[in-house]
């Protein structure tokens, strides 16, 4: 009976979106790819460059933050704010109440920006493209599950 209960718990855990094991993996891989302070600006700009390669129309969404010069201080600062928020959310994946409050706050901020599901999907593709270039091994399934948790929390 004890084995059956443990097995049932493992099945539930494995079927959960962004389960505990996936959370640990994503946190570890994010820390490796996001790197240290001196590398974060380049990493962040690379993420946005890839976003614009995937969805060129999204570039217009950033006209107010200096996107015309992707190496400008204004655009770099914006990129760092976005990846800083992503860093914060990834660190909260195992803290349901905290991440839910943070996602609700970010959803409120993004509601007025006329974003749709395709914008969040494109950012997810950019993450899935850039993060692995900084790793020896990348778990696409775990990242897909955990990014979906974040994106759906912001986009509603």
UniProtKB/Swiss-Prot annotation:
Keywords: Disulfide bond, Heme, Iron, Metal-binding, Oxygen transport, Secreted, Signal, Transport. Hydrogen sulfide binds at residue 79. Residues 17-156 form the Globin domain. It comes from the Eukaryota. GO terms for molecular function: heme binding; iron ion binding; oxygen binding; oxygen carrier activity. Disulfide bonds join 18-146. Heme b binds at residue 110. The extracellular giant hemoglobin is able to bind and transport oxygen and hydrosulfide simultaneously and reversibly at two different sites. Belongs to the globin family. The 400 kDa hemoglobin consists of a spherical 24-mer arranged as a double layer of dome-shaped dodecamers. Each dodecamer is composed of the 3-fold trimer of the tetramer A1-A2-B1-B2 having one intra-tetramer (A1-B2) disulfide bond and one inter-tetramer (B1-B2) disulfide bond per tetramer. This is Extracellular giant hemoglobin major globin subunit A1. The gene is ghbA1.
């Amino acid at each position: 009976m004890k084995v059956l209960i443990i097995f049932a718990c493992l099945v539930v855990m494995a079927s959960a979106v962004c389960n505990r094991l996936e959370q640990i993996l994503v946190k570890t891989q994010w820390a490796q790819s996001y790197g240290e302070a001196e590398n974060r600006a380049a990493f962040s700009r690379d993420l946005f460059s890839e976003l614009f390669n995937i969805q060129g129309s999204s570039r217009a969404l950033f006209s107010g933050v200096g996107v015309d010069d992707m190496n400008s201080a204004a655009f770099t600062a914006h990129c760092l704010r976005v990846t800083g928020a992503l860093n914060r959310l990834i660190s909260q994946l195992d803290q349901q109440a905290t991440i839910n409050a943070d996602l609700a706050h970010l959803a409120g901020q993004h509601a007025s920006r006329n974003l749709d599901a395709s914008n969040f999907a494109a950012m997810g593709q950019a993450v899935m493209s850039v993060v692995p270039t900084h790793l020896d091994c990348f778990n696409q399934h775990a990242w897909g599950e955990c990014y979906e948790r974040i994106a759906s929390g912001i986009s509603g």
